[in-house]
Design a protein with these regions (language model features):
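Domain-level signature for soluble enzymes in the chorismate/prephenate branch of the shikimate pathway
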Residues: 1-104
Length: 104
């Protein structure tokens, strides 16, 4: 196998792991959305999002690698956006029919 094919196979394997981890993270986000709903909390928690992004930037700096803090922040902003969407969908699906007209 030539080096290009080897690297592409490695990327495919890494992508598989990333998808598994992203789905695991998404499942956690959906459970968090349910808990927030039960506690009457807002889905959007700017302090927590800032904490996550700061943690990611710190990990990037500590671990090094070609992706700098700005790139990692952009990637995780998208991940967080999708997690927030899933939290909203999860809570709207779990509302009882009599809650649907309650205005949020």
């Amino acid at each position: 196998m030539n080096p290009l094919d080897e690297l592409r196979r490695r990327i495919d394997a890494l992508d598989e792991k990333l998808v598994e981890l992203l789905n695991e993270r998404a499942s956690c986000a959906m459970r968090i959305g349910d808990i927030k709903h039960q506690l009457g909390m807002e889905i959007y928690q700017p302090e927590r999002e800032a904490e996550v992004l700061g943690h990611v930037r710190a990990l990037g700096a500590a671990l090094g690698g070609p992706l700098g803090g700005d790139a990692l922040t952009r990637v995780f902003e998208r991940i967080i956006d999708e997690a927030r969407r899933l939290e909203r969908e999860s809570t709207s699906e779990n509302k009882a029919p009599h809650d649907a007209g309650a205005g949020g």
